[in-house]
Each structure stands twice: as structure tokens, then as C-alpha cells.
Curated annotation (Swiss-Prot):
The keyword Transit peptide does not apply. There is a cross-link at K98 (Glycyl lysine isopeptide (Lys-Gly) (interchain with G-Cter in SUMO1)). Expressed in trophoblast giant cells. This is High mobility group nucleosome-binding domain-containing protein 5. Residues 1-429 are annotated as: Disordered. Residues 35-44 have a biased composition (Basic residues). One of its GO terms (cellular component) is chromatin. There is a cross-link at K64, K98, K121 (Glycyl lysine isopeptide (Lys-Gly) (interchain with G-Cter in SUMO2)). Pfam families: HMG14_17 (PF01101). PANTHER family: HIGH MOBILITY GROUP NUCLEOSOME-BINDING DOMAIN-CONTAINING PROTEIN 5, NUCLEOSOMAL BINDING PROTEIN 1. Keywords: Chromatin regulator, DNA-binding, Isopeptide bond, Nucleus, Phosphoprotein, Transcription, Transcription regulation, Ubl conjugation. Preferentially binds to euchromatin and modulates cellular transcription by counteracting linker histone-mediated chromatin compaction.
């Protein structure tokens, strides 16, 4: 029979060993875990996507730390054995361990070394487990009083690190199994990925070949179209050039025809005037008139804007351009008396004055050369002095002389109207 302790000791401590051990707080020492021989870290060559997949696949359930109670749990004690309640390992520590495992497995040579080390550790742990079991069996059969109890206490304290080692060994085995499975999955996935990559590469090469063929055909068609467009443009340019040349030639012919018609009209008008008036002086001065006609033609070619001066309608344009519109407004209906009205009035009322002044017949012969013939008449009176100098000044003084003569004639016509129908014409000297 084991010896009993004193009453004072019994009141302080629980009676059974299991109750005493369960009441004692268990010190958690993570330093006791065996650290694996870590290899030199290499640069990570794995893709970030694969790492994220691995991290997502191994989800760790959250474990809440259980508070160690100091109460006596009699139900948990069986056959005098004490169940040691340890604080579970926190989540961060498990993640750190797995990170170390992943880093170690990245190297090619690191895998073999780890396998050898883990095998040796597993053997040692199994031997320790067997020793612990034997010790427990022996202690159960011992009934040696206080010494036995003291020995059991010391044994219990020694058992604690053994139990921690056992749990570490189990975790290591689980980790190894998981790693093996992951490697197999990775190998299978890599094979499938390589096959998919090969298929994609072949499809891409076929598409590239088709695109090159399309580009070549499009390039040939584009060249043909460009050449056709160039030929079409050249033909259109030739046609446009031919049309422009035709228009230029037609314009020149029209100009020549108009010039010829003007010359014919001038000559016809002169001949009619010569026949009606029957003046010998005009026949004597035909050579001079031809000179004036040639000079007038040169002026026409030099200044095309002066053709209106030599036509019947040119007088109206001169009056408008030279600022004599006010005269036309004030004096009334001068345009009626300018062209045909003037000739009619002069024929009816002032033919005697025209016959008296033979030197100014040329004014009524040519519409645009009245100033020239006036100067010619003066030349006859003065003895034909310096004919060349006057011819040079004719172009400048043509318009002014014509306008002066017309203004004088219009003033005369007004006088006739005011005085009534008088038979005495006013001279235009």
C-alpha cells in the first residue's frame, strides 16, 4: 500500500497524479522543433500565377487557441494517464513552416537532401515513441508510494518534449505527402500545358501563312489597280490638253474673223460716205486714211479694251467709264442723239455745215477715229506739219477729242430744240 501524505499536503494538492498534471500549465516551446537543413536560396523561376494557384489550393483552417484551464478534468483521466492539453500552433507559424518547405523544394538538389533527412528523423521519432510507451507501461504497474509518484512526475515532465516531437513528425509526414501530390499534379498540368502550347503554336503558324498569302494577293491586285489608275489619268490629261488646244485655236479663229469683219464694216462705211458725199478731197487723201487704218489696227492689237471705241456702241462705254454719267443725267436723253439720232439731225438740219467744213468729214466716217481725222483736217490747213508727232499723240487724245466733239454736238442739238425748228445749224468749230 502506498503511503499517505499528511493532511496539510493533501489539502494543497489533488489526490491523483492525472489531476495534478492536468492542473499544471504546459509551457509551449516552439524552439524544440527540429529545424531542417535549408539549402542556398535560388532565384525563383516559377510564374506568379502558379504560386497563387498553390497558395489557394492549400487552404489552412483557422484554429482558435484554446485556453488552458487549471481545473481538474476527471473524465479525461483514464487508467491513471494524464492527457496533456497543449495550446495549438498559431496560423502564422504554420504558414512560415510551409514557406520554408516551398523554398527548400524549389532547388533541384534540395529535394533529395530533404528526403534523406526526413527519413532519419522519422526513424528517431519512432524509436522515441516506443521508449515512451514502454516507460508508461512500467509506471502503471509500479505501486511504490511517494518515490513512485515523484518518479512519475519527473517522467511526465520528460514525456512532454517526446509528445511534441511525435506531433512534429506527424506534421512532417503530412507535409511530405502533400508535396508529393502537388508535384504529381504539377507534372500532369505541365504536360497538358505543353500539349496546349504546341497546338496553339501550330494554329498560329497556319494563320500566319494564310495572312501572308492574302497580303501577297492583295499586293498584286493593288499594283494592277494603281497602274490602271495611272493610265486612266494620263489618258484624261491628254484629252483635256487636246480640248484646251482646240479651244485656243477656235478662240484665235474667232478673233481673226471678228477683226476681219470690223475692217470690212469700216471700209464699207467709208465707201458709202465717199459715194454719198462725192468729195474729191477724200479720194485725194485715201492713202492717209489707209495709214490711219493700219495705225488703228495696231492700237487694237495692243489694247484690246479699245475695240469698243471703234464700234457704234463704244461711245456709251466711254461716257460711262470716263465719269460723264452726270452729263447724261442732266442733259436728258443724249443716248438717242448719240448714234443714229445725231446722224439724222445732221443730215436734215446741218448738212450744209458738214459740206462747208470738209476737213471734219472723217469724224462721221469712223466711229472711233474722229479725233484722228480732225487732226488730219488741221494738217491740211496748216500744210501737213509734223505728221509723225501727231500720230504718236493720237492714241492718248482720241477719247478726249471724241467726247468734246460729242458734247458740242449735243449742246447744239439742245439749242435747236429750244429755238424751235430753225433751219440755221450751229457750227461746231
Amino acid at each position: 500500500m502506498p503511503k499517505r501524505k499528511a493532511a496539510g499536503d493533501a489539502s494543497q494538492e489533488p489526490k491523483r497524479r492525472s489531476a495534478r498534471l492536468s492542473a499544471m500549465p504546459v509551457p509551449f516551446t516552439p524552439e524544440l522543433k527540429p529545424k531542417r537543413a535549408s539549402t542556398s536560396r535560388k532565384t525563383k523561376t516559377t510564374n506568379v500565377v502558379e504560386e497563387s494557384k498553390d497558395a489557394g489550393a492549400t487552404t489552412i483552417p483557422e484554429t482558435k487557441p484554446e485556453v488552458v484551464k487549471g481545473e481538474c478534468n476527471m473524465e479525461n483521466a483514464e487508467n491513471g494517464e494524464a492527457k496533456i492539453i497543449e495550446a495549438p500552433i498559431s496560423k502564422m507559424e504554420t504558414e512560415e513552416v510551409k514557406e520554408q518547405i516551398n523554398e527548400d523544394t524549389e532547388g533541384d538538389g534540395g529535394e533529395k537532401k530533404e528526403a534523406v533527412v526526413t527519413k532519419g528523423k522519422n526513424d528517431e521519432l519512432e524509436a522515441n515513441i516506443q521508449d515512451v510507451e514502454k516507460d508508461e507501461d512500467e509506471k502503471e504497474h509500479e505501486d511504490t508510494g511517494e518515490e513512485g509518484e515523484d518518479g512519475e512526475r519527473e517522467g511526465g515532465l520528460k514525456e512532454k518534449p517526446d509528445v511534441a516531437e511525435i506531433e512534429d513528425a506527424k506534421e512532417a509526414k503530412d507535409d511530405e505527402e502533400k508535396e508529393d501530390k502537388e508535384k504529381e499534379d504539377d507534372k500532369g498540368g505541365d504536360g497538358k500545358k505543353e500539349e496546349e502550347k504546341d497546338d496553339e503554336g501550330e494554329a498560329e503558324t497556319e494563320e500566319e501563312v494564310k495572312e501572308q498569302q492574302k497580303e501577297e494577293t492583295e499586293g498584286d491586285d493593288g499594283k494592277c489597280k494603281v497602274e490602271e489608275n495611272k493610265e486612266g489619268r494620263k489618258e484624261s490629261q491628254h484629252e483635256e490638253e487636246g480640248k484646251e488646244e482646240l479651244h485656243e485655236e477656235d478662240g484665235k479663229e474667232d478673233l481673226h474673223e471678228e477683226d476681219g469683219k470690223e475692217d470690212l464694216h469700216e471700209e464699207d462705211g467709208k465707201e458709202d460716205l465717199h459715194e454719198e458725199e462725192g468729195k474729191e478731197d477724200l479720194h485725194e487723201e485715201e492713202g492717209k486714211e489707209d495709214l490711219h487704218e493700219e495705225e488703228g489696227k495696231e492700237d487694237l492689237h495692243e489694247e484690246e479694251g479699245k475695240e469698243d471705241l471703234h464700234e457704234e456702241e463704244g461711245k456709251e462705254d466711254l461716257h460711262e467709264e470716263e465719269g460723264k454719267e452726270d452729263l447724261h443725267e442732266e442733259e436728258g436723253k443724249e443716248d438717242l442723239h448719240e448714234e443714229d439720232g445725231k446722224e439724222g439731225q445732221h443730215e436734215e438740219e446741218g448738212k450744209e455745215d458738214l459740206h462747208e467744213e470738209e476737213g471734219k468729214e472723217d469724224l462721221h466716217e469712223e466711229d472711233g477715229k474722229e479725233g484722228q481725222h480732225e487732226e488730219d483736217g488741221k494738217k491740211k490747213a496748216d500744210g501737213n506739219e509734223d505728221r509723225k508727232e501727231e500720230e504718236e499723240q493720237e492714241a492718248a487724245t482720241e477719247g478726249n477729242d471724241e467726247n468734246k466733239v460729242e458734247v458740242e454736238e449735243e449742246a447744239d442739238n439742245k439749242d435747236f430744240k429750244e429755238d424751235g425748228e430753225k433751219g440755221e445749224p450751229v457750227s461746231t468749230v
